[in-house]
Every structure is written in C-alpha cells, then in structure tokens.
C-alpha cells in the first residue's frame, strides 16, 4: 500500500449534500422553506425526511445536480441480511442469482405496504444506472412527505426494489429535464413535477429558486432556503448572473446549473506572489453533490503547481508533502463582477496517519469544470430555475441564527439588493489563455503568464482520464454520478437520457419548456433532439473509450460538449456513493 493510501480515509465521496435537519416552514404564507444541512464526517451533507402514513424516517442524499427523488425498498435483495431489510434466499435479478453485497445496517429503507398514502404509478419502470456499474431499479409511485409537521402530498418518487447503490436514497432538486425517465426499457418517457416544482404548485414557495450556504468546512452545519435568501449568510455584494446553456445545439434552454467563469488564479497574500492561470471564459457547473473540484488538466496542473503538488498516476490524485503550511494562500475564482476566494485549507486532503502525503482536492478532467463543495463552502449561491439565473457572493462564515434575515425571491427572479452582473457570458469554447492579470490591482509581483494554447494542443493536454483517489473507481465523484453517487470529483453533468453503444451515442433531451399550471415543465409532446456521435469524433482517451461501450441510460452520467470541433465524451458518476480511498479535507 502506498503512502497516500495510509493517509487516506475510506469515505463516501458522494457529497450529495444531504439534508440532516429541517427547520420550521413559515406557516404564514411568506413563501419560503428552510432546511438545515448537517455536514457528516466532514465530507457530505445528509437529511432525514418523514415519508408515508404513518411516517417512515429515511435519510437521503440531497443533490442540486440531479432531479429525481428515490428511496431504497426494504426488500432489496442486494442488502446483506440485517434488521433494515427483508431476507431473501435464491433471489434473482435479470435471470441471475443475486449475491448480497451491500451493508445496509446504517441505511434506512422504505416499505410501501406500511403506508396508507402510497400510490403505485403504472407509468413505467424506474431505473438509474451509474458509471461505476451500480444501479437502482424499481417502480414509480407517489407519497406524502412530511416536513416539520407540514404534509406535502403527491410527491412522485422511485422505489428501488433492486439496488446496488450504497445509499438509502436521493433527493434531487435540479431541472426536471434531468430526470431519469428516458433511455431504458420500460421508461415512462415523460417528465414530471419534482420536489421543488411541487413546493411551488402547493404554494409553499412562489418561485422555483433556492439559496445554498454550506458554511465553513469545520462548522458542521449549513442551510438551504427554498424561495428566499438569507442576507446574513454572505458578505459584500450579491451579483446575479445568467445561467449558460452548455448544449445549445441540443436544447434551447439551460439544463444544468452552470454559469460563466471569467478567470482563475491563486495568490500568497503574505509574500505578495500570485499567478493568473486563465482569463478565458468557460462554463462551470456548481454542484453540491460534488465533493472536490474538477478542472481541465491544463488548469488543474497550474492550480496544483502553485503549491508544489504533483500528479500521482498510481493514486489518481495530486499529492504534496505533509504537513502543509496553508498560510495566506488562497485561490480566486473570477466571475467578472466579483471574485470568490477559497482558502488553501479547503483544498488540502489530510493523511490518516503521520508521515504520509497530503492530497490536493482538484481533479483533472477532459474538458469540464465542476465547482463542488470545496468551492461552494466559500460561496453563497442562489439558484433560480424558473428564470435561469445564478446569484453569487462571498460566504459569511461568521453568520449566526440571531442575525438571520430572510428575503423572498420575486417571481421574476429579482432579489432585493442584488446587482445585475455585467460580465459577458460564455458562448463557445476557446483555447485557454491569459490576456490579463486578475491581480493587477494588488501591485504584487506575478508569476509568468500561462502561454496561449492552440486548439489542438489544448485538446491533447486536456484529454486525460478523470480519476478518484482510487484508480480502480470508474466513476468520478466529485460528481456523484452514482458515484455521487458518482460523486467523487466528478462532473455530474447531464442533459438528458443517454444510451450509448460502441458505434453510436444518442442523447435525448427536451428542447422546450412549457408551463403546466404553476409548475414549469417540458411538454409531454415536446420534440427531443438527437445528437449523433460517430467514432471519428470521439476522443482517444482510453477511459472514455471504455465507457463508450458501456450501456448508460441515465442522463447524469455522460456529458457532451463540442470542444474545438471535437466532441469529448466524459463519463460522470452521479449518485453512486462509493467507498474509496480518498483523503479527508484538512481545515
């Protein structure tokens, strides 16, 4: 076992931000609902929801990057025998004998037969598969979910009768077009109003928007407020940016919670040394379900080099000598109208034992950039799915419950006191270059600029496999694609139901959105666009080639974006909370 494995902890890198505690819902019609987030094991967030009548308490992963709510059924034969599941001998799945492999003792499960409010839906099969090979398979139903004594009826969810995913369930709150309703046998092929949409239709909130505050990594708690912001949770100005459509040739509106980053750099405030890594506009996904930070290799290498970290091919992660003196080093993410500062301490993965290497919480990708929890803990983020807007500010780690000040988000997306960003959004990919210094106002010395890359060299440099701390992990969980259930460092980008074969990839995605009552959803007869992807266009990356032959049917698992006229396919694992040797963040 290498030194870094001695330093790492076996963790669930499924930073699916799970809700653990729920605060009171305002019952005076003020239009917002607040959840407290519990930071479990300093790695992820989790929550307990009361489901059914009488209620059954289930702890589920909470994820902004997915859209489905599903829970594990108590009869799941893949669970090792324990008190939470029924014991089945000689059970079969797809004609093969089931070999129990999941320790479900710490998980909560659901039994529909014990609930009088459960309604089975005959609209098709529920199925999600992840890039790491795990899956959840079952049926659709509706149920009553109780939040602090307030019943929310008719929540559609999946009941996983068979599941190899080591989680009790997932509560996804992303765009409905990310729902797992297409691309597999028996799929319902129709979008449905998911959890945040139901909150709006039940008039609990006025707009499908929510603000996320993860707080400092060592605080233990954060919060998410549906329908409002908390002015005490951020410092400085709150700027509102447009979401960007990462797939303009496939869909007509954004399908992911992505925005434009204008530049990126790092500085040592004590020594006044700094370096700008890029000033090229680029789309970034903000994902609470991703633990780490993913960046194209050419950028990830620069970020690591600033603190003398080097990439370990054996471990699949950047490493550096321990202990690390974090000092006044910080990474600065430039969005044009403001910069979000992330302290180096948030990016260091500490060893489990002394005398080992430390890890650096940035993972190289083919071409995607995903800002996971290590970034989000330093930011206050407002996601407005109705109006396709994202608002950002620097998080205030000194906020308290006493100073709380909730302000509702208006139906048109306007927020009292927020400023409209003026920075030009991303539209097409360009080579990474540095044409200016994002620290020009500091008067400090700068390292040499990163030289401009040609389109061809950029593709060559970024065409590398995204890895977790364990090179054996096929998924990335910075994203949790079922590895966020992919969530390792990964990109949990997705845009529609995907079916991949060795010679063709078909991506089905609704290209239009329509209002259904007070719920904004794609029309059932909206035309899906198909994106044909030939062998001649695929990347030569062996990791991508391997996954291109894997029949993936879940939208969250593969991401497509034209890059310099070359389509790069990236496999993302989402929802597969996988136990892997990953290092624990040091704060």
Curated annotation (Swiss-Prot):
Region Disordered, annotated ranges: 466-505
Domain of life according to the entry: Eukaryota
Catalysed reactions listed for this entry: Selective cleavage of 6-Leu-|-Lys-7 bond in the pheromone alpha-mating factor
Positions of the catalytic residues: 63, 287
Chief place where the protein resides: secreted
Domain Peptidase A1: 45-393
Glycosylation sites recorded in the entry for this protein: 84, 90, 268, 308, 366, 398, 468, 503, 551
Keywords, ordered alphabetically: Aspartyl protease, Disulfide bond, Glycoprotein, Hydrolase, Pheromone response, Protease, Secreted, Signal
GO cellular component: cell periphery; extracellular region; fungal-type cell wall
Record Gene3D superfamilies: Acid Proteases
Signal peptide (from-to): 1-24
Induction conditions: By alpha factor.
Localization of this protein: Secreted
Family the UniProt entry places it in: Belongs to the peptidase A1 family.
Function: This protein called 'barrier activity' is excreted by yeast cells mating type a. It is probably a protease that cleaves alpha-factor and thus acts as an antagonist of this mating pheromone and establishes optimal pheromone concentration for conjugation.
Name this polypeptide is given: Barrierpepsin
Organism: Saccharomyces cerevisiae (strain ATCC 204508 / S288c)
The organism's taxonomic lineage, starting at the top: Eukaryota, Fungi, Dikarya, Ascomycota, Saccharomycotina
């Amino acid at each position: 076992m290498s030194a870094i494995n001695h330093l790492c902890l076996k963790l669930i890198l499924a930073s699916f931000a799970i809700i653990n505690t729920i605060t009171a819902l305002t019952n005076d019609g003020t239009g917002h609902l607040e959840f407290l987030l519990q930071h479990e094991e300093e790695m992820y967030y989790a929550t307990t929801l009361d489901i059914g009548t009488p209620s059954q308490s289930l702890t589920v992963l909470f994820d902004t990057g997915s859209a489905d709510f599903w829970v594990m059924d108590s009869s799941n034969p893949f669970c090792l025998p324990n008190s939470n599941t029924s014991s089945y001998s000689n059970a079969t799945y797809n004609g093969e004998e089931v070999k129990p492999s999941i320790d479900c003792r710490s998980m909560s499960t659901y039994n529909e037969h014990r609930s009088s409010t459960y309604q089975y839906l005959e609209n098709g099969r529920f199925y999600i598969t992840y890039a790491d090979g795990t899956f959840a398979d079952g049926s659709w139903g509706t149920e009553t979910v109780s939040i602090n004594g307030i019943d929310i009826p008719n929540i559609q969810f999946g009941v996983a009768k068979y599941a190899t995913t080591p989680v009790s369930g997932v509560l996804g709150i992303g765009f409905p077009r990310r729902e797992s309703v297409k691309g597999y046998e028996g799929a319902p092929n129709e979008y449905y109003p998911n959890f945040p949409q139901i909150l709006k239709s039940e008039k609990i909130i006025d707009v499908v928007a929510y603000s996320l505050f993860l707080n400092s990594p060592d605080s233990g708690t954060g919060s998410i407020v549906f329908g409002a912001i908390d002015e005490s949770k951020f410092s400085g100005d709150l700027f509102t940016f447009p979401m960007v459509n990462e797939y303009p040739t496939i869909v007509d509106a954004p399908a992911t919670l992505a925005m434009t980053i204008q530049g990126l750099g790092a500085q040592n405030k004590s020594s006044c040394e700094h370096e700008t890594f890029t000033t090229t506009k680029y789309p970034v996904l903000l994902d609470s379900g991703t633990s780490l930070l993913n960046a194209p290799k050419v950028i990830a290498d620069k970020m690591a080099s600033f603190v003398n970290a080097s990439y370990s091919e054996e471990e699949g992660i950047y490493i550096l000598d321990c202990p690390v003196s974090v000092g006044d080093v910080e990474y600065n993410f430039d969005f044009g109208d403001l910069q979000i500062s992330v302290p180096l301490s948030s990016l260091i993965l500490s060893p489990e034992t002394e005398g080992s290497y430390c890890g650096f919480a940035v993972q190289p990708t083919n071409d995607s950039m995903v800002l996971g929890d290590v970034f989000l803990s330093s930011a206050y983020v407002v996601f407005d799915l109705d109006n396709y807007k994202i608002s950002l500010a620097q998080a205030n780690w000194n906020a308290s419950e006493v100073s709380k000040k909730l302000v509702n988000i208006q139906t048109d997306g306007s927020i009292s006191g927020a400023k409209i960003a003026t920075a030009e959004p991303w539209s097409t990919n360009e080579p990474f270059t540095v044409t200016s210094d994002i620290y020009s106002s500091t008067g400090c010395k700068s390292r040499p600029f990163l030289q401009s890359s040609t389109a061809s060299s950029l593709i060559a440099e970024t065409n590398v496999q995204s890895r977790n701390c364990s090179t054996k992990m096929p998924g990335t969980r910075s994203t949790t694609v079922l590895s966020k259930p992919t969530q390792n460092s990964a990109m949990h980008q997705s845009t529609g139901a995907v079916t991949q074969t060795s010679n063709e990839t078909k991506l089905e995605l609704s290209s239009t959105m329509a209002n259904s009552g007070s719920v904004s959803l794609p029309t059932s007869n909206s035309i899906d666009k198909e994106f044909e992807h030939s062998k001649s266009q695929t990347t030569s990356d062996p990791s991508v080639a391997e996954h291109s032959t894997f029949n993936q049917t879940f939208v969250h698992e593969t991401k497509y974006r034209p890059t310099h006229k070359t389509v790069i396919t990236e496999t993302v694992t989402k929802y597969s909370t996988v136990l892997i040797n990953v290092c624990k963040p040091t704060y």
